[in-house]
């Protein structure tokens, strides 16, 4: 049975992301440029619109011991030791620390184009 609602789902993605607290970002390691959904920033305790080059690899709002694990995961991806990593980190927000689950994976089709897909879930 074919549904004939005639609606596009893409316009609803920001609202779905916000309600489900799922964030997504795409980051080019070679240029330091990227884009992220507002919820990705919020989950990371960051101000929406901050250049990703000021967040990725720095993670100033991540608890120091978790930050080191996250940097190690990023390094493993950069050096081709893995194409995906996931884990949980504590992120500082206005009320203290919250747990955020992260998934980091290669998004580029070519190894010469180091593009990462960064997802997080609050």
Where are these regions (language model features)?
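Acidic active-site catalytic centers that drive phospho-/nucleotidyl reactions
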Residues: 28, 66, 122
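PAS-family sensory domains
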Residues: 41-117
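Sensory beta-sandwich core in regulatory modules of signaling proteins
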Residues: 24, 116-120
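PAS-family sensory domain signal
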Residues: 2-59, 99-108
């Amino acid at each position: 049975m074919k549904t004939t609602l005639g609606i596009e789902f893409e316009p609803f993605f920001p609202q779905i992301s916000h309600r489900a607290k799922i964030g997504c970002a795409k980051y080019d390691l070679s240029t330091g440029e990227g884009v992220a959904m507002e919820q990705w920033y919020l989950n990371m305790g960051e101000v929406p619109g901050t250049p990703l080059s000021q967040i990725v690899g720095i993670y100033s709002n991540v608890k120091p011991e978790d930050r080191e694990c996250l940097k190690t995961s990023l390094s493993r991806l950069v050096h081709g030791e893995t194409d995906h990593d996931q884990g949980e980190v504590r992120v500082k927000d206005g009320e203290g620390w919250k747990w955020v689950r992260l998934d980091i994976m290669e998004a580029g089709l070519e190894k010469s184009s180091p593009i990462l897909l960064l997802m997080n879930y609050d």
